[in-house]
Amino acid sequence: MFDSIEIAELQAKVRIRVIDDDEDFLKSLGLLLEMTGWTVRTYKSAKEFLSDENFSTPGCILLDLRMPEMTGLELQRNLITQNKNNLPIIFLTGHGDVDSAVYTLKNGAFDFLQKPTNPLLLNKVIAEASQKSLSTQPKNSQRK
């Protein structure tokens, strides 16, 4: 578990990427995370994320499972194929089932959470995933 000083130091070094096609949820979650101290970038689709993200800042991805055009599973596979899987993925979905959870975790997802989720649990999982990302990044690529 992290204490408040460790969380604040971690938050200063990472970015949380949130990808969800539900714009109201996206705005609400982005605001919640920012209010708790995280730097957040939101994306309405996997394609928007792929075209905009540079993957150099450590952190993690909060990813919806079901989205039009490209699902969360397809994005996960795409990132693995392109060798851009350096950011831990936390699936956050209202459409989860055991098979989907097992599949995503076997393919490298950091965690699989159901919507709605407890904000304290979400913050803990984000901190753990971000710490993992930070510990695997070269020192010169960490955000200041």
What annotation goes with each model-predicted range?
Residues 73-85, 103:
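Short amphipathic alpha-helix used as the core "switch/output" element in two-component signaling
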Residues 67:
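Receiver (REC) domain active-site loop signature in two-component systems and cognate sites
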Residues 20, 63-64, 93:
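Active-site residues of response regulator receiver
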Residues 44-45, 71-75:
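Acidic catalytic/metal-coordinating carboxylates
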Residues 97, 113-126:
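C-terminal output helix
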Residues 1-17, 30:
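Non-catalytic signal-transmission and effector/linker regions of two-component phosphorelay proteins
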Residues 5, 23-41:
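Two-component/phosphorelay signaling modules centered on CheY-like receiver
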